[in-house]
Amino acid sequence: MIRKINLEHILFLDIETVPEQENFNLLDDAKKELWEHKSKYQRKDGISAEEFYERAGIWAEFGKIITISVGYFNYTGNDRTFRVTSFYGEEPNILKEFKTLLDTHFNQPKHLLCGHNGKEFDFPYIARRMIVHQIELPEKLNLFGKKPWEIAHLDTMELWKFGDYKHYTSLKLMAHVLGIGSPKEDIDGSMVKEVFYKEKDLDRIIRYCELDVITTAQVFLRLRNDNLLEEEEIKRV
């Protein structure tokens, strides 16, 4: 079925998130209490809410988006390119620019969004943060009242599950199993908060995020049994 999808109709994406504040003590008292309540079932072995705040970026209610990277295929005759770009800066601006992209270029029923674990993380996270900032949801993220088959979302992790709802496979593992080579990653997801707040190296995070977009596209190609992208076909714009 996925072989019938026109690759030019898909927007591949990945987001990077961090806690809304650099540390727990910068939260107001109400937010501290809410975090303590929210995290108590995840915390183990006597870990305090303050210590566990390192992971707050996972939740849209306590985190924020620092970059959205996207990629899309373009065909000119027999020539194939995969263009990658990123939105970064203040979160409201990131979200507005991303919304403009969707509203302008990916607004038709034929268009699809694709991410790795996108249905459980990236897509709802973006939608929730848009609502927080009073940004009208673009059609591709507005799921209210839609039937499951009307939702234009693809998820490489879900495609790999083959109905096994318990199965979780990281993008890195999938790429390795499917024989997809990639440059050595400079960082991983657990390091993003420190690189953002301590090192203040957003460019490093953007490179990591863009690599995940490229890898997601490569995984999707393998799931279709298509040829993988060559380095010269990838254009960062």
How should these model regions be labeled?
Residues M1-T100, T104:
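Conserved RNase H-like, two-metal-ion catalytic cores of nucleic-acid enzymes
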Residues R3-H9, G63-G89, F106-R207, L211-T215, ...:
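Metal-dependent phosphoesterase core characteristic of DEDDh/y 3'-5' exonuclease domains
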